[in-house]
A protein has these predicted regions:
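PP2C/PPM-type serine/threonine phosphatase catalytic domain
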Residues: 1-296
């Protein structure tokens, strides 16, 4: 169903990739999601944020985040777009939301998730805060996925529940990291290779929490055009939400189709090191800080 969904938009198109985004209010009174995409030379910058907080706080937080991240990254020289640039951009967004909340009492406690993907000819650089996700698909199969900063996914990492149990848990809306809640935010920027024909998906929990991941992956088995794919994904999720009573969450997704191979590729030792690093990250071995934030 396309009820409550905005039109799918072409948000970036270069020799590297094409990216379309779409958002919808779902069954809520306001849409607290925001997304953005932009081209800087041949590079592409993409962000999806899912806000939280009453009195327009969630909307405000996610809007500040996508704006601040894009503006900060756009100020970097093209050759410097990478890990350091993303750290600085997300830090700037976190500080801007935190300051705004301090200066505007009705907005106190507002925050937002964030996913950031920067595609350069060398590699894909990405980070996430909270439970919005980035997927990398290759030939219809999952090549990579971010691991949610949430209470239930801490339990998944400790083998206390499966991912499907986590998805259906009544505690699935409690996240352990968000932008704007503290003066500083803990994050990890990853550098991963990509190949021609790969597809990246950035999405909020309103997308992935509606249907099991295997069902979501099936939607991408038929290699449709980028715009058709983001339309199909959002309309499928929206339709399921309507069938379940129509009080479903906001839903936002960006679909990216890659047109060439990155110059950076993994070696065997690098892959082994990454596997260990990811497992540590999943267990929360960042700076040891964790704070539960309940989302509406």
């Amino acid at each position: 169903s396309s009820v409550g969904l905005e039109e799918a938009k072409l948000i970036a198109s270069t020799n590297l990739c094409d990216a379309f985004g779409r958002t919808g209010i779902g069954g809520r009174k306001e849409n607290q999601d925001n997304y953005t995409g932009m081209s800087v030379g041949n590079n592409v910058i993409l962000t999806v944020c899912d806000g939280m907080g009453g009195m327009n706080g969630g909307q405000t937080a996610s809007r500040i985040a996508v704006t601040e991240i894009a503006q900060t990254l756009a100020e970097f020289p093209i050759e410097e777009l990478g890990e350091n640039a993303i750290y600085k951009a997300v830090d700037a967004a976190n500080a801007a939301i935190y300051r705004r909340a301090l200066n505007d009492p009705p907005l106190r406690g507002m925050g937002t998730t964030a996913t950031v993907l920067v595609l350069t000819p060398e590699a894909a650089y990405l980070t996430h805060v909270g439970d919005s996700r980035i997927y990398q698909l290759r030939k219809g199969k999952k090549e990579f996925r971010t691991f949610d900063h949430s209470k239930v996914f801490e339990m998944v990492a400790q083998n206390m529940m499966t991912e499907e149990q986590a998805r259906q848990s009544s505690f699935s809306n409690i996240i352990t990291r968000a932008l704007g809640i503290r003066p500083k935010v803990d994050m990890v920027v990853e550098k991963i290779p990509y190949k021609k024909g790969d597809r990246f998906i950035l999405c909020c929990d309103g997308i992935w929490n509606t249907l099991p991941e295997p069902e979501m992956m099936k939607l991408f088995l038929a290699k449709s055009a980028t715009k058709e794919e983001v339309e199909y994904l959002t309309e499928t999720v929206n339709g399921i939400g309507e069938q379940r009573g129509g009080d479903h969450d906001n839903l936002t997704a960006i679909v990216v189709d890659v047109k060439q191979k990155s110059t950076y590729q993994y070696g065997c030792l690098k892959l082994a090191g990454l596997a260990i690093k990811r497992q540590l990250a999943r267990l929360g071995k960042g700076n040891g800080k964790s704070r539960n934030v309940k989302r509406s």
